[in-house]
């Protein structure tokens, strides 16, 4: 999907599976958390059916109806996630492309269904975020005062929108449209990079141009 003659001013990046290969780390964290709680989930099942979903939706789909239990499991998963960072890899070609784009005056945002704490911690591990873009590695819970913030110039991206920042997650296009609104850009001026089917559907519905990433 392209918009001939338009100038791209804004790049929106999904994080998990697009900017960083976090599939195995996410999978292992969920499997370990659920095993502790007495639930059975294989790595293969999570990777094939649930990767890319917002945590609360995923836990609901596997039959965990109690909101308090879902929140407890979410926090435990976030706490375990950094222990699997040895499996996380940066998509270096895409990252270098975005750095060049920013150097020429473009804007780059991360737009993800993941939690802000998980994104910050993974970026810190990969060495691609300035000091004001990340929190302490040991802090797994959401800091609502930083929801959808624009970041200072010394940071590696211009803004981050995480799963908690919009009411409707992907495949709804709300997260992408909100990032465009905050930057004052139209869909014709925006390019999206995504990997998952739900992310690609959100990109299509946003009206922007998009690329599918395969890691």
What residues fall within each predicted segment?
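Short beta->alpha linker loops
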Residues: 25, 50, 54, 76, ...
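Active-site neighborhood of HAD-like aspartate-dependent phosphohydrolases
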Residues: 2-48, 205
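Substrate-recognition "cap/lid" segment bordering the active-site pocket of phosphatases
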Residues: 115-191, 197-205
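Short glycine/proline-centered loop/turn elements that form peptide/ligand docking sites
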Residues: 95, 196-199, 210, 214-215
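Conserved phosphate-coupling serine/threonine residues in phosphotransfer and NTP-handling enzymes
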Residues: 18, 112-114
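Glycine-rich phosphate-binding loop signature in dinucleotide/nucleotide-binding domains
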Residues: 4-6, 103-106, 183-189
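Alpha-helical substrate-recognition element adjacent to the catalytic core
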Residues: 28, 36-66, 80
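Metal-dependent phosphoesterase signature
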Residues: 60-100, 104-106
């Amino acid at each position: 999907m392209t918009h001939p003659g338009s100038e791209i001013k804004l790049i929106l990046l999904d994080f998990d599976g697009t900017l960083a290969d976090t599939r195995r780390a996410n999978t292992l964290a969920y499997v370990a958390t659920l095993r502790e709680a007495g639930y059975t989930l294989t790595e293969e099942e999570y990777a094939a059916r649930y990767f890319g979903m917002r945590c609360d939706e995923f836990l609901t789909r596997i039959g965990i109806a109690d909101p308090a239990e879902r929140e407890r499991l979410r926090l435990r998963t976030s706490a375990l996630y950094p222990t699997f960072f040895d499996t996380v890899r940066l998509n270096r070609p895409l990252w270098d492309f975005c750095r060049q784009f920013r150097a020429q005056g473009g804007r780059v945002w991360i737009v993800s269904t993941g939690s802000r704490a998980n994104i910050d911690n993974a970026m810190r591990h990969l060495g691609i975020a300035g000091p004001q873009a990340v929190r302490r590695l040991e802090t797994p819970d959401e800091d609502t005062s930083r929801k959808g913030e624009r970041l200072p110039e010394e940071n590696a991206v211009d803004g981050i929108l995480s799963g908690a920042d919009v009411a409707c997650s992907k495949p709804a296009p709300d997260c992408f449209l909100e990032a465009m609104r905050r930057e004052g850009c139209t869909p014709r001026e925006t390019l999206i990079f995504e990997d998952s089917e739900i992310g690609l559907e959100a990109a299509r519905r946003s009206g922007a141009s998009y690329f599918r990433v395969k890691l």
